[in-house]
A protein has these predicted regions:
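Iron-sulfur (Fe-S) cluster-binding segments and ferredoxin-like electron-carrier domains
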Residues: 106-136, 163-183, 198-212
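N-terminal secretory signal peptides
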Residues: 1-12
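N-terminal export leaders
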Residues: 13-34
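Immediate flanking context of iron-sulfur cluster ligation sites
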Residues: 84-103, 137-160, 175-194
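C-terminal segment of N-terminal export signals and the immediately downstream linker at the start
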Residues: 11, 32-74, 212
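Short, structural beta-strand-to-alpha-helix junction motif
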Residues: 79-85, 110, 122
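Short linear motifs in exposed loops
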Residues: 75-77, 119
Length: 212
C-alpha cells in the first residue's frame, strides 16, 4: 500500500509566510527604536558640544579665541564650527546661519582682517587668531562707516543677510577692486540677498569707497 502524499510535511501557505515574516520585520523595527542607555550613547557620535566653563569632558579640547578684542578661553568639541561656537557658546548671534554650506555668505566674519565663512571653518583652527564679528565692528552710538552707509542707502530689507554683507563689504575695502559697480558686484558675489537689495548694497559700498 502506498503512503498517502498528504500525510507528509506541508509547505506553509502564502498567508502564513506573510504573517510570519511580517512579525519578524516588525520586531526588528521596534528593536531599532528601543531607547539607548546613556552609557552606550556616550561612546557614539552626537552633536558637537562646546562649553565656556564646566567639567573636563572626554574629547573636548581647550582653545583660546580672541573675539572682538577679548581673549576667550573655551573648551570645545573638535567638530564645532566657528559659526556654532560664536552663536551657541559666546552668544554672538549677529553672525547668521543661512545655508550652513558656505554658499550664502550670511556667516561671514573677519579672521586676522580677512573675510572667512565661519560655517566652513572649525573653531579649533583659529586658536590665538584675531576674530571680528559684526558686534565688534561698531556700536549703536558709534557705527562703522559701512554700517552707517547701509542705513543711509536702505541696503537691506529683511536684514537676515545684512551682517554678512557688511562684514564682506568692510573686508573688501582692503582688497584689490576696480572703481565701477561691476567690480564691486564681483567681489560681493559670495553674499546672497534673497530680498534683492543688491543695487542699494552696491551704492552703500561705493559711498564708503569714495569717502575714504
Amino acid at each position: 500500500m502506498q503512503d498517502d502524499p498528504r500525510s507528509g510535511p506541508t509547505k506553509p501557505t502564502r498567508r502564513e509566510f506573510l504573517r510570519n515574516t511580517g512579525g519578524t520585520a516588525a520586531a526588528a523595527v521596534i528593536a531599532g527604536y528601543a531607547p539607548v542607555s546613556s552609557d552606550s550613547a556616550a561612546g557614539q557620535g552626537g552633536p558637537p558640544t562646546t562649553s565656556a566653563e564646566g567639567p573636563n569632558i572626554e574629547g573636548v579640547v581647550s582653545v583660546t579665541l580672541r573675539v572682538n578684542g577679548k581673549d576667550r578661553q573655551l573648551r570645545v568639541d573638535p567638530r564645532t564650527t566657528l559659526l556654532d561656537c560664536l552663536r551657541e557658546t559666546l552668544s554672538l548671534t549677529g553672525t547668521k546661519k543661512g545655508c550652513d554650506h558656505g554658499q550664502c555668505g550670511a556667516c561671514t566674519v573677519h579672521v586676522d582682517g580677512r573675510r572667512v565663512l565661519s560655517c566652513l571653518s572649525l573653531a579649533l583652527m583659529h586658536d590665538g587668531e584675531d576674530i571680528t564679528t559684526i558686534e565688534g565692528l561698531g556700536t549703536p552710538a558709534a557705527l562703522h562707516p559701512m554700517q552707517a552707509a547701509f542705513l543711509a542707502h536702505d541696503a537691506y530689507q529683511c536684514g537676515y543677510c545684512t551682517c554678512g554683507q557688511i562684514m564682506s563689504a568692510v573686508a573688501m575695502l582692503k582688497e584689490p577692486c576696480g572703481p565701477d559697480d561691476a567690480a564691486v558686484k564681483e567681489l560681493m558675489s559670495g553674499n546672497i540677498c534673497r530680498c534683492g537689495a543688491y543695487p542699494n548694497i552696491v551704492a552703500a559700498i561705493q559711498h564708503v569707497r569714495k569717502s575714504t
